[in-house]
Amino acid sequence: SWNTYHVNISEDLIRKQAEALVTNGLKDAGYLYINVDDGFFGHRDETGKMHAHPGRFPNGMRPVSDYIHSLGLKAGIYSDAGDNTCGSIYDDDANGVGSGLYGHEQQDMDLYLKEWNYDFIKIDYCGAKELGLEEEKRYTTICEAIRNTGRTDVSINICRWAFPGTWAKDMARSWRISSDIRPRWSSVKHIIEKNLYLSAYGR
C-alpha cells in the first residue's frame, strides 16, 4: 500500500484492494499477498502493546487479515527494525514514532503473527538507520523473535533499499535491492538490470 498511499490507508481501502486482486484475475495468475504497509499504527499502551489506528482501522487488524484470508489470499504487515517507522520520518506521521520493533521484538511478532494472524512481514530500516544499528545483527534478532512465535510459514522481507548481503538469503524469503520502484518502465527496467547478478542468491 505504500507506493500509492503512503500512510493514508484504511481498513476499507485494504479490503477493496483484496477484492480487486480477486475480481481482476490476479489471484488466478498467482498474486496472493495483500500487504498493509506503514500507517496502521495507533499507539502503544502502558504494557508496550501496539494498537491499531482508531480512525484508519477502527475494528483492529485481525478482522482485516481474516477478510483477506476469506478470499483465499495471504495477509502482510509492516514494521521497522528501529524504534521509528519510515512514515514518521518521511510523512511526519507521529503515530510511527516508537512504533518500530526496537525493544519490542517478541511482543510485536507475537501480536502481528499469532494474535493478528499475518503471513508476511516487511521489515524496513529507516528507524534502525537513524540509530546506527548493525544490519545483519539487527535482522538476526528479529528473525529469532519470528521463529519463537512457532510460525514456520511466515514470509520475511528485508527492506534495506539495496542488496543487504549474502546473509539475507538464510533469513528472509525476499529482500529489497533498490530504492522505491516508480510507476514507469524505466524504473522497472533499472531493477531488472540490478537483478542480473543477484539472481544467484535467490532460492
Listing of model-derived features with the role each one plays in the protein:
Residues 118-121, 125-154, 158-162:
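Extracytoplasmic, non-cytosolic globular domains
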Residues 4, 17-131:
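Aromatic-lined carbohydrate-binding/catalytic grooves of carbohydrate-active enzymes
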Residues 7, 44, 58, 164, ...:
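Residues in flexible loops and secondary-structure boundaries
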Residues 104-107, 154-203:
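Glycan-recognition surfaces
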Residues 16, 59, 63, 134-137, ...:
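Generic recognition of stable, solvent-exposed alpha-helical segments in well-folded globular domains
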Residues 1-15, 20, 146, 154-157, ...:
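N-terminal module-boundary/linker segments of secreted carbohydrate-active enzymes
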Residues 49-51, 92-94, 138-142, 170-175:
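Short secondary-structure boundary/capping segments
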Residues 26-28, 148, 169:
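A generic structural signal for short, solvent-exposed coil/turn residues
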